[in-house]
Amino acid sequence: MGLRKGLLVAGACAALMGLSAAPASAKDLVIHAGRLIDGTGKPVRTQVSILVHDDRIVSVDAGYTTPSGAEVIDLSGSTVLPGLIDDHVHITQSFHKGDPIHTAMTRTSFDDEIDAVVNARNTLMAGFTSARDVGGDTQVVVALKNAIKGGLIPGPRLWVAGTPLGPTGGHGDAANGLDPELEHPGWT
């Protein structure tokens, strides 16, 4: 396995270690890591056991050790690193092909929610265990955050801003670029 692929796999596993789709439980988990980049700037450590209790890392020990009753994830052939944090995401957005005006006029918050569920899983699998959503439909992002926190769907731990604020015609105005002939009396 190449270094890039190994880091990607390890990042995803580290993400799953920090936040899984299941709610926190008292069960212990141990990860046998072939290589550990701990994020402190120290040299890479080899052949370590990472003990996780209640979704939190409680120790990193030299060698492959397994406490009694712990579930083992064998990453002895992989590189593991801490979960990453993305501090600027729009988790409900997806860039669809086709006419952007048509998309803006026909998409609903339900479409955004479906995209958000897919994007949350993809974000987690890319190694990001925490993300800050800086603008999206408030009901959608709060529901997504709660579903992840409750273990209903996989995704990173989320901090959400809700619907972005801005001046009419400014950044974040969904009506930007629309033909004036498409105006609706209820929009003013």
What does each model-identified segment do?
Residues 79-152, 168:
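Metal-associated gating/positioning segment near the N- to mid-region
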Residues 21-26:
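Boundary at the C-terminal end of the N-terminal hydrophobic targeting segment
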Residues 9-18:
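Bacterial N-terminal signal peptides
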Residues 152-188:
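Metal-coordinating catalytic core of metallo-dependent amide/deamination hydrolases
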Residues 36, 40-81:
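Histidine-rich, glycine-flanked metal-binding segment
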